[in-house]
Amino acid sequence: MTKKRNRGQAGVTLIEMMVVVTIIALFAALVLPKMMHQADRAKVTRARADINGFSTALGAYKLDTGVFPTTEQGLQALRTKPDGVENWQGPYLQKEIGGDPWNHPYVYRYPGDHGDEPDIISYGLDGQPGGEGFDADIVSWKN
């Protein structure tokens, strides 16, 4: 026995289903990369904001103590008083110092290689010095 399909009977053929799946796949292929780049751009912006916040807090630290924290004391000196430091009035940052937006530690150097201010660096997405695009370093002396 064979059943005939009535004109009023609704249904989706395999071809129609494949066309819909193909359209969805093409849409995802076009939209997802742009969304991923937007997230990476937001991380670069956050890293710059973090570095600017550290620089501001370091300025207040220096006003109180007369010096910047050493490389060994690091950015933690903005949250916890280092041994032997006079006139520390911190904490100079409200939140704990975590990693950069890619979960790599920020690099702090004082004395720095770029003037009288400390060097603060996020090594970007790849966590390695140098790089281009989202792998590029985000640094305090270029903000």
Question: Where do the PLM segments sit?
Answer:
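Conserved hydrophobic/amphipathic alpha-helical signal-anchor segments
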Residues: 9, 34, 38-83
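Alpha-helical hydrophobic helix detector
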Residues: 18-34
